[in-house]
Amino acid sequence: MCWTMPSPFTGSSTRNMESGNQSTVTEFIFTGFPQLQDGSLLYFFPLLFIYTFIIIDNLLIFSAVRLDTHLHNPMYNFISIFSFLEIWYTTATIPKMLSNLISEKKAISMTGCILQMYFFHSLENSEGILLTTMAIDRYVAICNPLRYQMIMTPRLCAQLSAGSCLFGFLILLPEIVMISTLPFCGPNQIHQIFCDLVPVLSLACTDTSMILIEDVIHAVTIIITFLIIALSYVRIVTVILRIPSSEGRQKAFSTCAGHLMVFPIFFGSVSLMYLRFSDTYPPVLDTAIALMFTVLAPFFNPIIYSLRNKDMNNAIKKLFCLQKVLNKPGG
């Protein structure tokens, strides 16, 4: 997903005249990382801890939902799919970040860069669409509870989950194919800590206006998903506030509290990353925003879904109890 779009001719017109004397770029160098002598190892271990936490916590959520029959309903099914996507979303960028933190040459191959962009943004797209599906699910459950079971059938839930992932990967494919055919003739320095669409496009030594059109389509898709989610939750909160008993309000709110927290974290981090009043930020601020977007937001999501949810907590406890039983001699 990419909301900020560089000018299609940024950096290309001047490089076109020079491209004949320059060799083709085969790798990109990241300039957003500190050097080893500047203490990059101090960043390595906290990032490794956060990545490990994200993977383990999301695996616990996914496994708990799959193994506990009490959680076999649309809401938890969507949460488990979201956790599964989060595992791969962070894996698309953080392992390479860790590698670059302990390497002298902080580089990535052209093919590796294109693949990282594709999987990172495709997974991000899938998560955004899945969050829209989750908002619609909560809308039906709270605003039309009598027909919920009839509307949100297991078959429909499976179709919505698969459709979210499929659409997320397909919508970016034409743009990535076009980027893979662009000539890059230097420079090859990406002013970021991972391969992102805007920094990479700015290095192309040709016209990128067709890709700009693709970005506009993506922006419209993102705005539509944001509006659907926002309007759904506005309606949900309105209905909850009309429930006469405080116990009923609390019970209804508890079923969507996690979604209400993840929604602003997800779209807030995306907005900070791509909705900019300036094309460039100071390097330190740019890196900090990128870390929040790629690391901190995924770090908080499983905490919200696991620690703040009683049913999920109980399912995870059962998972640990089952593991203890299986580890006993003769178990």
From Swiss-Prot:
GO BP: any one term: detection of chemical stimulus involved in sensory perception of smell
Top-level division of the source organism's lineage: Eukaryota
Entry's Gene Ontology cellular component terms: membrane; plasma membrane
Extracellular side stretches: 1-41, 92-115, 177-212, 274-286
An annotated Gene Ontology molecular function: odorant binding
Record field: transmembrane: 42-62, 71-91, 116-136, 156-176, 213-232, 253-273, 287-307
Cysteines engaged in disulfide bonds, as pairs: 113-205
Predominant subcellular localization, coarse grouping: membrane
Cytoplasmic side: 63-70, 137-155, 233-252, 308-331
Membrane topology classification: Multi-pass membrane protein
Glycosylation sites (chain numbering): 21
Record keyword ATP-binding present: no
Alphabetical keyword list: Cell membrane, Disulfide bond, G-protein coupled receptor, Glycoprotein, Membrane, Olfaction, Receptor, Sensory transduction, Transducer, Transmembrane, Transmembrane helix
Protein location: Cell membrane
Entry's family note: Belongs to the G-protein coupled receptor 1 family.
PANTHER family: G-PROTEIN COUPLED RECEPTOR, OLFACTORY RECEPTOR
Physiological role: Odorant receptor.
Protein name, per record: Olfactory receptor 6K3
Originating organism: Homo sapiens
